[in-house]
UniProtKB/Swiss-Prot annotation:
Binding site for NADP(+): R48
Oligomer status and interactors: Homotetramer.
Cofactor info, note text: Reduced FMN (FMNH(2)).
Annotated CDD domains: Chorismate_synthase
Cytoplasm keyword on record: no
Catalysed reactions listed for this entry: 5-O-(1-carboxyvinyl)-3-phosphoshikimate = chorismate + phosphate
Pathway(s) annotated for this protein in UniProt: Metabolic intermediate biosynthesis; chorismate biosynthesis; chorismate from D-erythrose 4-phosphate and phosphoenolpyruvate: step 7/7
Record carries keyword Flavoprotein: yes
Enzyme class at the top of the EC tree: lyase
Gene, per the UniProt record: aroC
GO CC term (a single one): cytosol
Protein name as it appears in the record: Chorismate synthase
Source species taxonomy: Bacteria, Pseudomonadati, Thermodesulfobacteriota, Syntrophia, Syntrophales
Length: 354
């Protein structure tokens, strides 16, 4: 299986399956001398670990990080950093009845068609459990971006059809200090109601995550095929639940006039930001704004039609332990992927300028 590595200079490879012994990441290209501890990575992992919140999977993984290499006396050495997270609460027996059945909305069918076999235990490599390794790697990337003054923040824009009032809503760490990472408290209350309804109905919900990048310098990004927006979108789309990414005004530009979509400049800087902080694939120094559409969790207890490996029809109701919605656990995953892309471009920029 290829496609497990992202990055050119700051390179991250993740490995492991949902019900294997462990998952983890190897980071190559991290500069030496950065202060790095297990506590720093653990703080990021604790934001996405399972078993936290009323609507999260009851799978109780501690997600304790272990740094195996690349750090000496609390500082990165410049050699590959190996990160390990042991799986301690896998309940593989809950998936025995799914060995020969394809779950709707999952990668079961496509993995089987590609490889001729699949790990039916929680989705194997296709499981959202893999994203814990991304979050761990993103915490390391955040050290690189923080040194450049960059701050990445993701938050809930919409959940189950309830959207925040973006006009006048302040997005900062203080306003997001709630279980749904939602800056609009009234919207968060209604979102919680939708989650309760979906859980009681044996169903799940999707949502939209917003991402803002502040303090990003102008000049990052590589034309033509390695444009900043192309790499950010690709990194975010690599998250299993993500089905769409908008940058800046996104799809709304299709209904605009050029006079509306162009961002005028003045001696003091840009007067608008429909571009979302990126022009011609290169950052312009303005805030990078993104929106990420996340599909509902496909594992639901409601009856669904599917087939088995022989093509026979099956009616399936999925047991096991599952979230009602990927939000808010997906939020640190989105932040991590953006951090990894930005760290890579920061280091690449050092190779093209004196």
């Amino acid at each position: 299986m290829s496609g497990n590595t992202i990055g050119n200079v700051f390179r991250v490879t993740t490995w492991g399956e949902s019900h294997g012994g462990a998952i983890g990441a190897v980071i190559d290209g991290c500069p030496p001398g950065l202060g790095l501890s297990e506590q720093h990575i653990q703080a990021a992992l604790d934001r996405r670990k399972p078993g936290v919140g009323a609507f999260a999977t009851p799978r109780q993984e501690t997600d304790r990080i272990e740094i195996l290499s690349g750090v000496f006396e609390g500082r990165t050495t410049g050699t590959p950093i190996a990160l390990l997270i042991r799986n301690r609460d896998a309940n593989s027996g809950a998936y025995d009845g799914l060995r020969n059945i394809f779950r709707p909305g999952h990668g079961d069918y496509t993995y089987f068609k590609k490889y001729g076999l699949r790990d039916h235990r929680g989705g194997g490599r296709a499981s959202g459990r893999e994203t814990a390794a991304r979050v761990a790697a993103g915490a390391v990337a955040a050290l690189v971006t923080a040194a450049a003054g960059i701050d990445v923040l993701a938050y809930t824009i919409a959940l189950g059809g309830v959207s925040i009032s973006e006009s006048g809503t302040t997005v900062n760490r203080e306003s997001l200090a709630n279980p749904l990472c939602c800056p609009d408290q009234e919207a968060a209350r209604r979102m919680t109601g939708r989650l309760e309804e979906a859980r009681n109905a044996g169903d799940s919900l999707g949502g939209i995550v917003g991402i803002v990048v502040r303090g990003c310098p102008a000049g990052l990004g590589e034309p033509v095929f390695d444009k900043m927006d192309a790499q950010l979108a690709g990194a975010l789309m690599s998250i299993g639940t993500v089905k769409g990414v908008e940058i800046g005004a996104g799809f709304a530009v299709a209904g605009m006039k050029g006079s509306e979509s162009n961002d005028p400049l003045s001696p003091g800087g840009f007067l608008a930001n429909a571009s979302g902080g990126i022009l011609a694939g290169i950052t312009n120094g303005e805030q990078i704004n993104m929106r990420v559409a996340c599909k509902p969790i496909p594992s639901i207890s409601r009856s669904q039609k599917t087939v088995d490996r022989e093509g026979n029809p099956v009616t399936l109701s999925i047991g096991g332990r599952h979230d009602v919605c990927v939000i808010p656990r997906i939020i640190p995953v989105c932040e991590a992927m953006v951090q990894i892309v930005l760290a890579d471009f920061l280091l690449r920029q050092k190779a093209v300028t004196l």
